[in-house]
Amino acid sequence: MKSKTNLDDLPVGITLGDPAGIGPELAIKIMSDQKIPRSKRLVFIGNLWALNETAMVLGVELPPLNLIHRPEDSVIGFNFIEPKVVQKPNAFRLGEVQAACGKSAMEAIEFGVKGCLA
């Protein structure tokens, strides 16, 4: 007999979306918001360079992130998965549409959906 899964124990996946959009900034705000429960397994999905680039522009330091390969490897706190590394465009600029950024967003969404269906 299969045991029931406690939904409170499951990781929560959050995709960064387009690296040139507001997704990375929202992720950073989530990480810095003290009202967000630190007792959950939050898994951010995207390209780490996008998060680092946005933190640099905002002038903030990222909190420690647990870099993982699979959602089931997540721990309580902030986790990060790069499903497929998409190289940062040479002329990357926040707020501008770029093919590589769209590809990065799609990779993150596909990975997140597959994780939900597993």
Question: Predicted regions span which residues?
Answer:
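Contiguous, glycine/small-aliphatic-enriched amphipathic segments in soluble metabolic enzymes
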Residues: 1-118
